[in-house]
């Protein structure tokens, strides 16, 4: 039962989502692996399940978009040589944030031209962002009236949604399946009490990803928001191209403290960052004088490529 398998977990959303950014009125349409992992841990605790499979064996990617039959992966941070003086070509590549799985190897080889890059960007039409006005029952203005506020949300089109890849042994994947089916109803992301973030979940074989995931190459592309341990950090940074993003948020546990408390700020390499030296990453403790540990998932899920 120790053989590792990779599964594709597909989320089709039944309601708008609120994936928080800096302001409540903002909302993203994707989420990082650590947000999903926190939701899995909370659900496992509520069901009184053993956490060892999640903590020790599970490796997941960030959640990436799909549209119809196309699954997208983050654009790797590599230099693509365009035609000299072709400014429109430069802009077309700059607009790209994701690359379809079927075009990923071509992109790494520099075989996608600016026209195809523009078509890829246009194909990433996933849904619509909007603002919803809510009324706070707690906050009131100087006239004693309830204070309105705006919530950013994103509604996926029927044939679009998010997916992630999960790696683990059979027992770990079995527990993941139990937890994901429970999360369908409680939802994922912010404003779940208002019905946001509910989805239908299917778990499939990794299929069209297999050839990409099995290839070897001279560069490693990060598919999860991750951070190296102190022991790994120096070696992995040599010649790496990466973006760092700040990860923060509030502790959701009701037993951690008597009031709402923020987690320690944490910085992670963004998905799409490229390295010549792989690292494993780990799950970090970001608690800050609370009653128990608070986990921040930062394990690395890799895709190798040739450039």
Curated annotation (Swiss-Prot):
Taxonomically, which superkingdom? Bacteria
Q: Which UniProt keywords apply?
A: Antiviral defense, RNA-binding
Keyword presence, RNA-binding: yes
GO BP: any one term: defense response to virus
Has keyword rRNA-binding?
no
A single Gene Ontology MF term assigned here is: RNA binding
Q: Which InterPro entries match?
A: Csm4, Csm4_C, RAMP_III_fam
Provide the family line: Belongs to the CRISPR-associated Csm4 family.
More info: Encoded in a type III-A CRISPR locus.
Query: What's the subunit arrangement here?
Result: Part of the Csm effector complex that includes Cas10, Csm2, Csm3, Csm4 and Csm5.
* The protein's role, per its UniProt record: CRISPR (clustered regularly interspaced short palindromic repeat) is an adaptive immune system that provides protection against mobile genetic elements (viruses, transposable elements and conjugative plasmids). CRISPR clusters contain spacers, sequences complementary to antecedent mobile elements, and target invading nucleic acids. CRISPR clusters are transcribed and processed into CRISPR RNA (crRNA).
What this protein is called in its record is CRISPR system Cms protein Csm4
């Amino acid at each position: 039962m120790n053989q590792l398998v990779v599964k594709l977990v597909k989320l089709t959303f039944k309601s708008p989502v609120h994936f928080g950014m800096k302001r409540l009125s903002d909302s993203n349409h994707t989420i990082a692996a650590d947000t999903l992992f926190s939701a899995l841990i909370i659900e496992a605790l509520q069901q009184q399940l053993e956490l060892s499979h999640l903590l020790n064996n599970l490796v997941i990617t960030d959640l990436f978009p799909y549209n119809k039959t196309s699954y997208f992966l983050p654009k790797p941070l590599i230099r693509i040589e365009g035609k000299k003086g072709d400014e429109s070509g430069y802009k077309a590549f700059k607009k790209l944030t994701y690359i379809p799985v079927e075009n990923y190897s071509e992109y790494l080889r520099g075989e996608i031209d600016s026209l195809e890059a523009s078509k890829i960007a246009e194909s990433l039409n996933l849904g619509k962002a909007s603002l919803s006005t809510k009324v706070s029952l707690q906050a009131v203005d100087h006239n004693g009236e309830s204070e309105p506020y705006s919530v950013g949300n994103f509604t996926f089109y029927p044939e679009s949604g998010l997916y992630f890849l999960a790696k683990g042994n059979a027992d770990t994947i079995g527990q993941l399946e139990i937890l994901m089916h429970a999360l369908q109803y409680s939802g994922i992301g912010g404003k779940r009490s208002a019905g946001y973030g509910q989805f239908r979940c299917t778990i499939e074989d990794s299929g069209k990803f297999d050839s990409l995931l099995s290839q070897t190459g001279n560069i490693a592309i990060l598919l999860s928001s991750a951070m190296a341990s102190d022991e790994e950090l120096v070696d992995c940074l040599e010649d790496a191209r990466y973006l760092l993003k700040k990860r923060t948020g509030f502790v959701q546990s009701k037993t951690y403290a008597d009031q709402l408390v923020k987690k320690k700020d944490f910085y992670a390499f963004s998905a799409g960052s490229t390295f010549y030296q792989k690292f494993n990453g780990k799950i970090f403790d970001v608690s800050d004088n609370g009653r128990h540990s608070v986990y921040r998932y930062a394990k690395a899920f890799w895709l190798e490529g040739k450039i």
